[in-house]
Amino acid sequence: MKIEIQKDPDPKRLEELGVRAWPIWEKEISEFPWHYDEPETCYFLEGDVIVTPQGGEPVRVRKGDLVTFPQGMSCTWKVRRPVRKHYRFG
């Protein structure tokens, strides 16, 4: 399962997706397991995270990244700088 990351996506793309209308999620510096029951697309407003999929290689996600996490993926999040992101499931 692959995490898709678009670094500094075009503002027009973010507008097309309606990112500003998505809810916001925030998390302090921490480490925790997570499982995606459905796909999630999110846009990082702040933060620095290492996401390590079960059986996979760590991926770094930072402010300005548009990320899609696949359905069915289990992983560990290591929040290195507090996160603030818009998100959408499905």
Segments from the language model and where they lie:
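Short acidic-glycine-tyrosine-enriched beta hairpin
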Residues: 55-71
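Short, conserved beta-strand element in jelly-roll/cupin
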Residues: 36-51
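Double-stranded beta-helix
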Residues: 1-3, 9, 23, 84-90
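Conserved short histidine dyad/triad with adjacent acidic residue
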Residues: 8-10, 18-37, 70-71
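Short histidine-centered beta-strand/loop micro-motifs
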Residues: 17, 32-36, 53, 59-60, ...
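Short hydrophobic/aromatic-rich beta-strand segments that constitute the beta-sheet cores
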Residues: 34, 51, 85-87
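Ligand-binding loop in jelly-roll beta-barrel domains
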Residues: 71-90
